[in-house]
UniProtKB/Swiss-Prot annotation:
The gene is pyrE. Its EC number is 2.4.2.10. Pathway: Pyrimidine metabolism; UMP biosynthesis via de novo pathway; UMP from orotate: step 1/2. Pfam families: Pribosyltran (PF00156). InterPro entries: OPRT (IPR023031), Or_phspho_trans_dom (IPR004467), PRibTrfase_dom (IPR000836), PRTase-like (IPR029057). 5-phospho-alpha-D-ribose 1-diphosphate binds at residues 25, 71-72, 98-99, 102, 104, 124-132. One of its GO terms (cellular component) is cytoplasm. It comes from Buchnera aphidicola subsp. Acyrthosiphon pisum (strain APS). It is an enzyme of class 2 (transferase). This is Orotate phosphoribosyltransferase.
Length: 213
């Protein structure tokens, strides 16, 4: 099985991915919903780490360290580092930020490997408003590091207020390379091949035509 389809299948079985009628924070009525917060077991995080690792290897990106934005990005960075070692024999360091600066003990807002003047991959689940990514970029640039790429689980490929998706807004800002494990196009292809899910095709295509980029 193609690993992208494997990821969608895994997400659907875990009820992380659902098809139906859902109101998003934006107010839009969506024919699908993706909730990565339901991935909360040891097996879940092992699998997620492997999906990110596969995506990183396939991208052929050159990088030195993984960075996980607090809070959801932290376990993703750890799991991906483990997967890269276990499956590709790459001993990749990781780093993450804390949301509260500490003046005592392990001072500062960074934990883990140094990112100073390193090539950094940012790992997050889904870019919605982009707040966590914006904050991460500031932290990384403060360390005189460069952003090799940003990896996310899902790109909804939707227009925002700027007529661009949040992801494409980032791409246009500084030509950041943003790679998603799956997109709405992958979801539609998956549903087309599943007889039990084909009823959702009209709504998915209509939604993509209305809000897609």
């Amino acid at each position: 099985m193609d690993w992208k389809k494997e990821f969608i299948d895994f997400s659907f079985k875990k009820k992380v991915l659902k098809f139906g009628v859902f109101q998003l924070k934006s107010g839009r009525i969506s024919p699908y919903f993706f909730n990565s917060g339901l991935l909360s077991t040891g097996i879940d995080i092992i699998k997620i780490g492997l999906f990110y690792a596969r995506s990183i290897i396939d991208s052929k990106n050159k990088f030195d360290v993984l960075f996980g934005p607090a809070y959801k990005g932290i376990p993703i960075a750890v799991a991906t580092s483990i997967a890269l070692k276990n499956h590709y024999n790459l001993n990749v360091p990781y780093s993450f930020n804390r949301k509260e600066y500490k003046e005592h003990g392990e001072k500062g807002d960074l934990i883990g490997s140094t990112i100073y003047k390193k090539r950094v991959i940012i790992l997050d689940d889904v870019i919605t408003s982009g707040t966590a990514i914006h904050h991460s970029i500031k932290i990384i640039e403060k360390q005189e590091a460069s952003i090799s790429s940003i990896f996310v689980l899902l790109d909804r490929k939707e227009k925002g207020i700027r007529k661009l998706s949040t992801i494409n807004h980032f791409r246009n800002q500084k030509s950041y390379k943003i790679i998603s494990i799956i997109t709405i196009d992958d979801l539609i292809e998956y549903v087309l091949e599943d007889k039990k899910l084909k009823e959702h095709i009209p709504q998915l295509i209509k939604y993509r035509e209305k809000y897609g980029i």
